[in-house]
Each structure stands twice: as structure tokens, then as C-alpha cells.
Amino acid sequence: KELFNIDVPYREVQFFNLQKSFDLSDEQYDKLMEAGHLPENLLSYEETPGASETINKWVDEGHEVFIITGRPFNSYEPSRKWLDEHHLERVPLFCVDKYGREIFEHEYEYNMTLEQLYSMTFDFAIEDSPSAFEHVLHFNNCKVAVFDRPWNRQAEFPNDNFVRCKNWNQIDKLFEEYAGNVG
């Protein structure tokens, strides 16, 4: 709203693609993405209730947990700081060029290409972006908690491994059921 005087309530954001949700020009979208990933904005985001408690519980139980985001590579430092401030310092963070936005080669250990991501193995994932569902399909038999958001409510799930969850309690319950069945 501050940038373009466009007011779309959160519950009405129908698409993960904010350019489409807010009907922005390419130039406006670029400006929005730049502003949204400024360190001061990233550091101001509120935590989703239950997230850090649940993730830390999994780490305490001995599960290997990674946070993988499609944020731009240059947002790593403020994202890492935010995680640390929310007691997630034990969880590695990786920025993956999921959306083909990166135009420069960045040789940092915390940035990865899709090919590098696909070489990893995951049993459980949490995703809210329908455009990223295709990436999760690369992991055989990976259970996917789809965090319920306005922009994914109309999305069709690729298969039965994708389960909609309304909050972190439901995500944790799904994880515990899945971990109990495969462990």
C-alpha cells in the first residue's frame, strides 16, 4: 500500500505471484520485490505462531531440519539474523533460486541452484507456494504439509502426499504421524 497505494487485504491475496495479486507492472513488481527484501523489512516480519517451538522440538528429537527459501541470495544475512533472533540458530538456512530470478553467480555455501537442491533427500517438507510444488515432487515419497494461505486455497495438489495444514500444531501432528510410519 505504501509503494503504490494499492490495498489488498491479506485474506484476498489470491496468488503467490504478487505481481498478479496486486495487478502490478513489471517495474512496480521489481520495486516491490526490492522493498520486500530490504533487511529492515525482513527483520520486521512477525513469526507465525508455533513455528520456532515446533522446529526446535524436531531438532531436539534428533531430526535433521533445513530451512530452504526462494528468497533472493542477497537476503541471506537478514534472514539468518531473523531466524537467530527467533531461536532457530541451530537450523541451517539455504536460499535456492527456485524462481529463476538470480542473474549473478553467487558462490556462497548457503546459496544453491535447483540442481543442488534436487541432489538432496527429504522425507518431509512444508510449503505454501503452489509454484514450488513441482520442486518438492523431486523428492520421492516426501510428505508435504501445505501451509494454508489465501494464495494456495484454490491450488490442486499434485498427489496424496500433499496435505493442507492450517497451523503449526497441524503441521507437527502430520509430521509425527509420518515420522512414526517411516521410522
Residue ranges and their predicted role:
Residues 73-126, 130-137:
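Substrate-recognition "cap/lid" segment bordering the active-site pocket of phosphatases
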Residues 1-33:
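Active-site neighborhood of HAD-like aspartate-dependent phosphohydrolases
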Residues 68, 96, 147-149:
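Generic beta-sheet signal
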Residues 85-96, 121, 157-180:
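Structural recognition of alpha->loop->beta junctions
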Residues 124-166:
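Acidic, Mg2+-coordinating phosphoryl-transfer loop and its flanking beta/alpha structural elements
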Residues 101-106, 153-160, 174:
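Short, charged, surface-exposed secondary-structure boundary motifs
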Residues 38-66, 73-79:
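Short, acidic loop-to-helix structural element flanking the phosphoryl-transfer center
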